[in-house]
Amino acid sequence: MVNQTHEFLLEMTGVSKEFPGVKALDKVNLNVRPHSIHALMGENGAGKSTLLKCLFGIYEKNEGNILFLGKEVNFTSSKEALESGVSMVHQELNQVKQCSVMDNIWLGRYPKKGFFVDHDKMYRDTKAIFAELDIDIDPKVKVATLSVSQMQMVEIAKAFSYDAKIVIMDEPTSSLTEKEVSHLFTIINKLKEKGCGVVYISHKMEEIFAICDEITILRDGQWVDTRPLKGLDMDQIIAMMVGRELTHRFPEKTNTPKDVILEVENLTALNQPSIQDVSFELKAGEILGVAGLVGSRRTDIVETIFGVRERSEGHIRLHGREMKNRDAHEAINNGFALVTEERRSTGIYGNLDITFNALVANVDEYKTKMGLLSDKKMKSDTQWVIDSMRVKTPSHQTHISSLSGGNQQKVIIGRWLLTQPEILMLDEPTRGIDVGAKFEIYQLILELAKKNKGIIIISSEMPELLGITDRILVMSNGRAAGIVNTKETSQNEILELASRYL
């Protein structure tokens, strides 16, 4: 695919970018070889996105040089970059979902037969690319019918159709199952075999070590180092990313759970397939993890407890009192809070400020006798969220979409703490958050446990569950396969339980 005549396919040297009052990039380097997978890492705000926007011409760099295949380039658009052989597979996929797969691949450059589109050639060419990349998708189906994993594969095939030399992948596995991740890695390795340089952006350390050859680390808009991954360990990478040693990935747990406060007995959701006969107890000050494979219905547990999913039978008792929780409003009044998995779609109101996002779950608390909103109390509570959650922001009027993922998540956790819950349920609380911010979220969770909150955490990251929980409930195909003490269990035992009812 790639005619290899250069040591580096892409050379970005001394790239700087300034905005009014802010130096976003300060002499940053990124050099990508052919036949290699190159990790680009750094905390949120380190400059990764700005660097790539300079490459694609979205931002105009103030200093530095960009060489592609040995020639200086200054792309003015993503389209120009793509047509030149530099492609990006975004975290949020940008496809025409009502069109067919092959339409999406060849959009704007359809093969012609006379005045008409040559659909037969388009089909054959798409099938040929899919065969080369080991992609099993019908080119004629609508993109809307595909899974996220399949949509990503279509984007990779599109890059391949442009004879891309550089393929940039931004958090490509954030919504994929383990099996889908494995298939994606197979396809990425095929690109590598054909001479491509793949730039791989991810917060998941395990993936970086599994697939990448080299790593470039940015911190605070500056280039820290570029090294072969061989010989590096996770602690060294984290230290370079955050500028200090994190001697532990998880804060030390010093809290001892107290008496049982929540009893869940034979919980079954109304609309199946979902959870069936799930039972567990939760103590004050306890952190209960929920593990399971994708499709094990972990999220259904907290949604049923919170009243957004109807139950057909079962009991929920808080301090021995039966809780109906027929909807989310009733659950909130009963002392339950839920931080949802999809932060962008169901957690934040991106175009609104921190005040709105912090207070939206508790609006009635701010109404005066006249029916107006108390500005003083709203400001006070917003400031409490910013201070207690350690949110990094210039102002409470800042749009939440401009904050990093970690700071957005802190605002959402603060929002629910304002409702004064006894039971806090967190679904994938650190997804898409960098390693330094994860540590801060873990600290907040442990502090809440010390205040005798009952905490339930759903996570797909096994080290996270083993690092901060007291016990782990393992789900398998909608049923509870077992509950294990975190200190006494292992990853293998959890995986065995997760497969029990498959």
Swiss-Prot record:
Its main location: membrane. It is a peripheral membrane protein. Keywords: ATP-binding, Cell inner membrane, Cell membrane, Membrane, Nucleotide-binding, Repeat, Sugar transport, Translocase, Transport. One of its GO terms (molecular function) is ATP hydrolysis activity. ATP binds at residues 42-49. SMART domains: AAA (SM00382). Disulfide bonds: none annotated. GO terms for cellular component: plasma membrane. It catalyses: D-galactose(out) + ATP + H2O = D-galactose(in) + ADP + phosphate + H(+); methyl beta-D-galactoside(out) + ATP + H2O = methyl beta-D-galactoside(in) + ADP + phosphate + H(+). It comes from the Bacteria. Transmembrane segments: none annotated. The keyword ATP-binding applies. It is an enzyme of class 7 (translocase). It is found in: Cell inner membrane. Residues 10-245, 255-502 form the ABC transporter domain. Its EC number is 7.5.2.11. Belongs to the ABC transporter superfamily. Galactose/methyl galactoside importer (TC 3.A.1.2.3) family. The complex is composed of one ATP-binding protein (MglA), two transmembrane proteins (MglC) and a solute-binding protein (MglB). Part of the ABC transporter complex MglABC involved in galactose/methyl galactoside import. Responsible for energy coupling to the transport system. This is Galactose/methyl galactoside import ATP-binding protein MglA. The lineage of its organism: Bacteria, Pseudomonadati, Pseudomonadota, Gammaproteobacteria, Vibrionales. The gene is mglA.
